[in-house]
Swiss-Prot record:
Gene: rplX
NCBIfam families, per database record: rplX_bact
Keyword flag Nucleotidyltransferase: no
GO annotation (BP), single: translation
Quaternary state and interactors: Part of the 50S ribosomal subunit.
Keywords: Ribonucleoprotein, Ribosomal protein, RNA-binding, rRNA-binding
Designated name of the protein: Large ribosomal subunit protein uL24
Family: Belongs to the universal ribosomal protein uL24 family.
Organism the protein comes from: Sinorhizobium medicae (strain WSM419)
Keyword Iron set for record: no
Stored Pfam families: KOW, ribosomal_L24
Length: 103
């Protein structure tokens, strides 16, 4: 079970976007990276194709999982993630507040 999943609210811990929050769009477990909406935005030069014009486009680049942390559901501050067995399901728990991250 992954600690960070698609749709999670995360906080950037280091780098040029330190302190910013965003939603995880995509997780790449093999590369240990994630794409976060509005974070680590880069400009790329796009060649013209049949269905797209040429020009400079902005998009989110992947960020390493060690540089992001899940936002605590209670106060929005970064927290580590633990696991707990709730009935017959394994759920993620915020270490900071003890709240269940996913139902």
């Amino acid at each position: 079970m992954q600690k960070i999943r698609k749709g999670d609210k995360v906080v950037v811990l280091t780098g040029k976007d330190k302190g910013r929050t965003g939603e995880v769009i995509q997780v790449m477990p093999k590369e240990d990276r994630a794409v976060v909406r509005g974070v680590n935005v880069v400009k790329r030069h796009q060649r013209q194709t049949q269905n797209q014009e040429a020009g400079i486009i902005t998009k989110e680049a992947p960020i390493h999982l060690s540089n992001i942390a899940i936002a605590d559901p209670k106060d929005g501050k970064p927290t580590r993630v633990g696991f707990k067995i709730d009935g017959d399901k394994k759920v993620r728990v915020a270490k900071r507040s003890g709240d269940v991250i996913d139902g």
